[in-house]
Structures are given as structure tokens and as C-alpha cells.
Amino acid sequence: VASHDRSGFAFSSDSKYKTGSGAYNDDGTLKQDAVVLYVTKDTAKTVTMTVKTDTNKTTKCDGIQNIIDALQKGKETRPVDIRIIGTVTKNDLDRISSSSEGLQVKGKNAYSDMKLTIEGVGSDACIKDFGILVRNAANVEIRNLSVLNFMDDGISIDTSNCNIWVHNLDIYYGQAGSDSDQKKGDGSIDVKKSQYCTISYNHFFDSGKCGLVDATPADSGYSDYLTYHHNWFDHSDSRHPRIRNGHNIHVYNNYYDGNSKYGVGVTSGSSAFVEANVFENCKYPMMSSLQGSDAKGKGVFSNEKGGMIKAYNNIISGAAGVVYANADSSYEAANAASFDAYLAAERSEQVAGSYKTLSGSTTYSNFDTDVSVDMGVTE
């Protein structure tokens, strides 16, 4: 098994578990006592594991959702590696514990160490007609899968999670929702009220809404610490990601390719460091609510207050516009009051507190230059 690029906040030394490798060691080898379960369309209902469910009790569980639910008891200490072969559909599963998303991974309490990997084997592994919900969990890895026709979200990392690593997925359309902006499904990979997660090396094919970050309700003492790196946003529309109440989000080395609405969007007091990305024919590479490029039209962020972006070393071509606070772009003159992002000349540059959002008077957190913050990246 090759060792993947383990970087970003999921691997920060500041995080609770310091890894998101699930059933694997950080060198890419399987943990010695890991249980490996092979799942195909024919075995998803019948795959068996004897799970420790109480201090002096084990339970024989049949079916992939039943096994994962038994892990929620919090008594099983062995890592579990679920390996999916070929295409597994919702109808192939024994059942689903999330009526809105599909397969559910849930810990007993907030931030429970699951030591769980869900991965595809080979180049054609696919889950179809359902997604995966992760809640109350930590040290969970999801990788090497195609995700097709998912129910609500493709991957939903929702509430009290940390050290979650989602990588090397191919994500296609989801099932159409009831809202006008859900024709391609809802979120491809959404992260809500969760910390120290890395979303990396994923390919989003023509997605409608790639990724929401939402720490609602807003809490001035809460930080998300999320990383998005080496993703390919391939003719997807928006939310790459859309960051609401999101504190300390690192977005780097992503490829934005023909995006019809916008790249990175920040609202509600968020701070994002956007560096070394390529924006090619992305309409508005970076946007903050109610100012800059967003203020030119009707607004795309539901009139939420603005957020702050520090931009550094990005390559932009074919955009409709970019407004920097402190420097002219090739598209427009600088505007210190109504801007999309602050343009840093050096990576170590701090954004002065005099630069604030028009709505909400938010300043940039400067988390990326704080020596006490380990972003999980070696520069």
C-alpha cells in the first residue's frame, strides 16, 4: 500500500489525534491488529464481523451498516478497514442509518476515535445512490471511491468530528433536490461543526455545490482548522468551498477549471488563506459577501455578512473580475473598502487590522502566520 500525501489540518500536531489515517499507520501500512472487511454488491448484506459491544460481550454482526453501528458502542479497539470492490448500490446494503445521506459512521460521543477507513479497491470501486454521513467521529479516512447519484450530500462531515481525511474520490452528480440550486444534488463534500479535517486529491465532475463549510451557530472561540488541497474542481459551479462562520481555512494547490459562478466564497466572519491555486476560466475566483465582485450583482450569499481572504501566489486567467484590497489586479483597480481578497506579496505577510469587511467589520485572523498554529504542511 502506497503512502499518500498526509498533510493538512487532519495531521496537525495541534489536533486531538494528530492523524486521520483511520485503520492505517501514517507510513501507509495497515495497523497490525486491523480487521479488514471486503465488501461487494453480493456481500454488503452478509459480510460478518464479531464486534466487542460491552466490557464482557461481543456481538456477531452481519451487513456493513450493522457492523458500523456496532462500532458506535465504543468498546471495539481494533481498527477497521472496509474495502469496497466494484459498484455497491443503496439496494445492496443491509440498511442505512441515515435516511437523508445513506451510510452512517457515528461515534458514541463527540470526537470518538473510530480508527476507521472506508476505501475502494482498484480503479472501479464505486458507491451509488447513497452517500456517507460522519458524526461524533475522529480518525476516519474515506478514499479511492467514485460517488454517484448520492442522496443529499456525497460526503457529509456533520457535527463533533475531528481528524477526518477525505481524499482521492471522484464525485459526480447527486440526486436532484427540491430547491432550484439542487438540480445536481446538494453538497458534494460538506463540513459542518467539525475540526481538523483535510479534503484532498478529489476530482469533482461538473458538481453544482462542491463544498459547504458551516460552523453555525457562530462562536468567536471556535476554530475549524480545515484544509483543501490538490483538488480538481472540474467545471463545477460553486462552493469550492463556501465558508460560513469558518475560522482558519487553508485552501492551496487546487485547480479551478471552468467554474461558472465562483471559486472560494467567504461569509459571516470567516478567514481563509488561499494560496498557490490555479484559477482557469473561473468566473470569480474569490468572493466575500456583499462587497467586491459580489456587490456587482444581486449577491450570491443570502445577504450574510462578509468574510476575509488572504490571497498569495495564485495563478488567475479568464476570470470576470478580481478586486484586491491593496493592489491592482489585471482586471480591476484596488479597492480598500470593497474587495474580494487581500493580496499578500510574501507568504509571511500579515493582513493589517485596518482591512475590514463592509458588512460585519471582520478582520483577517492571520492564523497562517501564527507560529503556535500547526497547519500540517511543511513549507
Language model features with spans:
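Extracellular beta-rich repeat passengers
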Residues: 1, 28, 36, 245, ...
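Right-handed parallel beta-helix
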Residues: 114-115, 119-124, 138-149, 161-177, ...
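Extracellular/periplasmic catalytic domains that process cell-envelope and extracellular macromolecules
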Residues: 29-32, 75-76, 110-111, 192-193, ...
